[in-house]
Amino acid sequence: MAIKRIAAMLLTSVLLLSCIGCAQDGRKEPGAEKTDLGLTAEVKPATDFTAKANAAVYDELDFDDKQEYEFATRGLIDAPETLELKDEDGTILWSQEAYAFLDDYEKAPDSVNPSLWENTKNNHAYGLFEVTDGIYQVRGYDMANLTVVKGDTGWIVFDTLMSVECSQAAMQLIEKNLGKFPVKAVIISHSHADHFGGIAGVMAKEDKADETLSIEEQLASGKIPVITPVGFTEHSVKENVYAGKGMGRRSNYQYGILLTPGVTGKLAQGIGMGQSTGTVSFMTPSYEITQSGEKLTIDGVELEFQLTPGTEAPAEMNTWLPQYKALWMAENCTGTLHNLYTLRGAEVRDGAAWASYITEAISLYGKDAEVTFQSHNWPHWGNDVVNDYMVNTAAVYKYINDQTLTYINQGYTSDEISNMIELPEALNKIWYTRQYYGTVAHNAKAVYQKFMGWYDSNPVNLNPLMPSDSAKKWMEYLGDVDKVLQMAKADFDKGEYQWVAEVTNTIVFADPTNTDARLLCADALEQLGYQAESGPWRNEYLTAAQELRHGNANFTASTKSTGDMVKALSAPMLFDYMAIVMDKQALADRDFTMNVILPDVGEQHMLRVKNGVLLVYADTLSDDADVSITCPKNALFAILTNNQETVAKAVKVEGSAELLTLMMENMNQFPITGANPFNIIEP
């Protein structure tokens, strides 16, 4: 029970959330009636300025070049006429049907950047596709792809989608068209949930090979090896737990969970149509690849692995299949500019290292590769095309890294660089390096952050006021807020949407009840969203606009978890999480030690709570601890969730049981449902 409780508590750390809009703080939600400035809370069409900005994209790019669409649709074997996956209660978990409106337009509507429209159409091409004879992909059944390689007697599966229900549907489509064969191995390319969450839809947990055996013994055992890059388990759970609630809330902005698909709503994300909301599973690997160049033969298929740590994920690897002259690029080349920084929040990625691993792949395999395929979007065929694809992708990441450093050394700040930097024209016009997911602007900020951190060296910015305090002082100095709003409305009518958003959001932070400021800010953000080429940027703008118009939202976890990822947390990770959720103020005057003995995993640790801080001493016990506990590792979940009934049954306590109770009672789990989540677009 404790594991189920903490699985629910941590669910938003890994998954997206669904929501129901509501007004907050008793504020009356604006309706269709007009304010003094003539504003309403309704969704608006594109303005003339936005329509012209989007129309100009047709002059910037070669829309007669249909190679990416041809690659996205090439090799189609089968696709259902409509695709909408539901759970047993009828809840929609994944839908391509929601994007059927794409067929109603000959060209992009005024409210959509035409380049993003092209990417959305390409990502709407779903079904079972042949990559080459013996390699097949199910695309469009989740944000990522499920790939199978035919061995002598069965399938080798590369990545398993986000949700069990989606991977089950994908495997059913494969079996319907290609026959039913056993799964001989599962290879997970990297440590993000949209690539491993559906594994229980591909194989049963009891069929996993014994990780204590050698890989040769695993393959001979008749069980299924689960093969990952080294560090997979640690990074799969760690990145999503420590800052999970913050990431979970921000993910709703990045992925547009509040938004309805449509020409004024959500479109593609650049690497797919969004994430599914089914059941997320997890299995620890039975075998880890620990060095580049390692070779395995599985069911007659030769595989050579290239580790690429610190690229798109902390633990990631490419795979070369020489018999097929096919190169699996994981998520290192995806047919779009990816993120050096993801908007939901995460550690920044190294653009130079990313480029270096791509060029290493070219050096190793580029001479022979006839097709590249990956975990998102579609393959690229032909040796010249493959090499150009990889070279150009590497060049974009390297350029952003190097040009940002050039500007840094010329004294420019992060905000200045993000406004200045542009790709060379030749790279900028390539469809598969366009900014559908990441952008040059925010990736440049990532490079700045990696090398310089948050501070721009201007002491005015060293210790600024709280945003709401600063906003109130601005309004105090400006005096007539109504006049400021009239000026902002005039600038809106001139198409100056970024400035209008900035000034009106300042008013919102000074006075969140100012309806004119909220609605004008929303209108400005909406137009910025319509102009955005990046799917996540569009989502960010439109989600903020919706929250300004209709208030914050109550959230409930829209996905289910098997709890396996939570069980994979090591004891040190659990102690780290305890330190995060512990009520530090309540324990600020306490100082005590606790020995923790975990016989089932052969570990012992000493914890010290000192002035509200939880310090962990690994592989150490105190001779005079205030309290000592002995329990299975999983019983730590009961302590974390203050499940005193389970603790009484599973935990042996010596010394001051009151201190254990005190610690448990001061574990502040972050709320998942009920009260509104933290604000983003307002104080």
Task: Describe the residue ranges of each PLM region.
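C-terminal motif of bacterial Sec signal peptides marking the signal peptidase cleavage site
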Residues: 18-21
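Feature captures hydrophobic
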Residues: 26-35, 490, 496-502, 506-509, ...
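Active-site metal-binding motif and surrounding structural segment of the metallo-beta-lactamase
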Residues: 153-154, 165-225, 508
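Metallo-beta-lactamase
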Residues: 130, 154-155, 162-165, 221, 227, 231-308, ...
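Alpha-helical segment of the N-proximal tetratricopeptide repeat
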Residues: 472-503
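Conserved beta-strand hairpin/beta-sheet module of binuclear metal-dependent hydrolase folds
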Residues: 121-182, 317-321, 325-331
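Divalent-metal (often Zn2+) His-rich catalytic cores of metallo-beta-lactamase-fold enzymes
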Residues: 38-50, 336, 355-416, 420-458, ...
